[in-house]
């Protein structure tokens, strides 16, 4: 004994359509009202043929099916309220959680010049709490010779100088037709460390004083590798309330690798689709600074500081990034008026799955175990629809392939080596043609990212169903 009930669509051409992991097909001969079809379950390899007739006066179709030389009853009845995977409300839209409090900056003390401070440095410039520039490729020799590049308002300036015995240096950058830039740099040491050297001080340019915050790139030997070594996925979280017409909605995302020597590599995809590569090294105080120029030579950038630390159930590194896009960037199609936003960032250690192991480990071992959720700007080219949200039940298999069964065309590709996901959604009848991407944060048990609809972006995420 047994049976099943499935929700299907009786199409305008009188064919039966079913959206699910099983295969159900059927056709109706319009001249006679006779229907035939079959149902196949790939899990059991069972195929059940069926046939019947349309009873127009009763408003249903009835017939029989045959399996293992036994017959059963077939009933197809009309309705628009039958349930199916994904027809229920998806519930609250989950968002990436941020730590309740920012990491504390390490205490430092001014120190005299020492050969132990020789090496490479990198860091940021700040003014009034905002990140305003960066320090790149800074090198100090054992004798105190100092060189590097300072980035202010998107402009890059090389500088040279010499640290005195007190660990201080004054550098002057001469600009043609513009006032000089003056830098006051001081060597410091993070309290409780033997090689956690820092550079403090300031650069004064065009009436603004920018504070210096740079760190020494320590040497991690093979016998004592960087404790942060490993793979991570990151999310750059959009505010809860953001107008996607004025600045990108959705979360930026990234894959990050920290080598045993503490070097950081990877690629960040910002919410507008712009990409930036990672660089730099984790400091002795587990801090990592990032400064990357964006949008050519327009002065755009993404910059900030992240701290590696364990925040239970939230993150393994966190901080903020300032993201600046100037007005009227050439050849840009989205957010042409520019924007200036500072967003929280969290990262999770990423453990690539073994064969047969689901990377999204909190999902149930069944079909339709996850939600794909989109929320933000209108996803349709048909203004009357005003399609601002979309929820679809999806299947994340133990082979880390992602499946969707439905009338619209949704493709999902997960790269298990990096933890990143990409996809598309096409629904021609409703004028939907989207691309999206995101990252799996294993520590929080969700995928977050962004989708592109026309010239605006919104939030894409996946959560357990």
Q: Which residue ranges define each predicted feature?
A:
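Mature soluble binding/inhibitory domains
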Residues: 1-465
């Amino acid at each position: 004994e047994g049976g099943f009930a499935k929700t299907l669509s009786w199409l305008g051409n009188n064919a039966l359509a079913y959206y699910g992991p099983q295969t159900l097909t059927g056709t109706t001969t319009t001249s006679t009202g006779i229907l035939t079809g079959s149902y196949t379950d790939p899990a059991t390899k069972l195929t059940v043929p069926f046939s019947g007739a349309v009873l127009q006066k009763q408003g249903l179709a009835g017939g029989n099916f045959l399996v293992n030389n036994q017959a059963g009853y077939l009933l197809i009845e009309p309705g628009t309220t039958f349930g199916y995977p994904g027809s229920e409300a998806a519930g609250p839209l989950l968002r990436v959680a941020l730590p309740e409090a920012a990491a504390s900056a390490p205490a430092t003390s001014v120190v005299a010049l020492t050969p132990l401070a020789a090496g490479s440095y990198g860091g940021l410039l700040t003014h009034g709490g905002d990140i305003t520039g960066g320090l790149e490729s800074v090198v100090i020799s054992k004798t105190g010779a100092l060189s590097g590049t300072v980035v202010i308002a998107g402009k890059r300036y090389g500088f040279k100088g010499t640290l005195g015995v007190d660990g201080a240096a004054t550098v002057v950058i001469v600009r043609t037709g513009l006032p000089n830039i003056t830098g006051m740099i001081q060597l410091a040491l993070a309290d409780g460390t033997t090689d956690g050297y820092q550079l403090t001080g300031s650069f004064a340019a065009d009436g603004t004083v920018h504070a210096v915050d740079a760190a020494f790139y320590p040497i991690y030997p093979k016998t004592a590798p960087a404790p942060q070594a490993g793979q991570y996925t990151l999310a750059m979280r959009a505010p809860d309330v953001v107008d996607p017409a004025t600045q990108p909605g959705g979360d930026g995302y990234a894959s990050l690798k920290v080598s045993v020597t503490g070097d950081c590599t990877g690629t960040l995809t910002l919410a507008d689709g712009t990409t930036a590569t990672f660089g730099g090294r984790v400091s002795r105080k587990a801090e990592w600074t990032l400064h990357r120029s964006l949008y050519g030579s327009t002065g755009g950038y993404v910059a900030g500081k992240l701290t590696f630390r364990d925040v239970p159930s939230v993150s393994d590194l966190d901080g903020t990034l300032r993201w600046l896009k100037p007005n009227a960037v050439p050849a840009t199609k989205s957010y042409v008026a520019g924007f200036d936003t500072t967003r929280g960032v969290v990262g999770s250690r990423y453990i690539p799955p073994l064969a047969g192991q689901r990377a999204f480990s909190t999902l149930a071992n069944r079909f339709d175990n996850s939600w794909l959720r989109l929320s933000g700007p209108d996803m349709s080219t048909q203004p009357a629809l005003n399609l601002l949200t979309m929820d679809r039940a999806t299947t994340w298999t133990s082979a880390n392939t992602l499946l969707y069964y439905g009338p619209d065309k949704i493709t999902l590709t997960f790269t298990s080596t990096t933890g990143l996901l990409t996809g598309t959604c096409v629904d021609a009848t409703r004028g939907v043609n989207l691309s999206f991407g995101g990252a799996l944060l294993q520590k929080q048990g969700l995928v977050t990212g962004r989708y592109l609809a026309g010239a605006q972006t919104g939030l894409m995420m996946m959560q357990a169903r």
